[in-house]
């Protein structure tokens, strides 16, 4: 089930397409609306379709959580797949041990830059949560592209993003933005690695990597990266 918006629909369709390519079967692909007080009808329809696991492409503090709780309460499902919008400490805390064994994914990498940003975050006293690395890197890429273009006009600096993001050039990690700007100002090249192991392909899409999450002992634990 997916939240009824562009994010949810696109994610659900992508999951179904790729899962079926691997030989899996999807029994139902149904939307749910956010902000409802009761999801028993939605859970009943999902349960009737059957399946070994329920994919909940929603939000952990909204309908997604309530669908999981209703599924557990009625015995409809006991194992869930949780995309990025459902990953957060509040969900296993709210659901408890019944969520153990569920799995999920979240953009992430075990690259050296990821640890560097994590250490910086801890030293500064803030939580390095989901999408922190990607947000940090997006801001850094824009700043470096502005420097390379000599302009803050998006029409001008967008042409420089690929140049500062990829090789050739000196590798740039979290905390080294000042160094990068000096290199660019001096006519040199940079290859921004950042916190999320940046590598842009095609028209500027991120090649991407993700963390594999397992809910265990009432907590989200990272068990691998791909």
Predicted regions and their residues:
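Extracytosolic ligand-binding ectodomains
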Residues: 1-226
């Amino acid at each position: 089930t997916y939240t009824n918006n562009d994010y949810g629909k696109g994610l659900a369709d992508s999951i179904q397409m790729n899962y079926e390519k691997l030989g899996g079967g999807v029994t139902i692909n149904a939307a749910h609306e956010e902000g409802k007080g009761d999801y028993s009808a939605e859970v009943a329809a999902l349960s009737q379709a059957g399946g070994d696991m329920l994919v909940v492409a929603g939000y952990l503090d909204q309908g997604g959580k309530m669908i999981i709780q209703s599924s557990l309460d009625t015995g409809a499902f006991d194992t869930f797949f949780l995309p990025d919008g459902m990953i957060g400490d509040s969900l296993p805390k709210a659901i408890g041990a019944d969520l153990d064994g569920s799995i999920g994914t979240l953009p992430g990498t075990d690259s050296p830059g990821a640890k560097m940003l994590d250490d910086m975050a801890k030293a500064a006293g803030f939580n390095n949560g989901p999408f922190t690395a990607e947000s940090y890197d997006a801001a850094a890429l824009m700043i470096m592209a502005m420097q390379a273009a000599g302009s803050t006009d998006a029409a001008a600096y967008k042409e420089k993003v690929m140049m500062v993001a990829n090789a050739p050039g000196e590798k740039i990690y979290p905390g080294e933005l000042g160094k990068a700007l000096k290199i660019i100002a001096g006519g040199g090249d940079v290859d921004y690695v950042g916190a999320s192991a940046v590598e842009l392909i095609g028209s500027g899409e991120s090649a991407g990597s993700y963390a594999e999450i397992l809910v265990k002992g009432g907590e989200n634990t990272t068990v691998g990266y791909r």
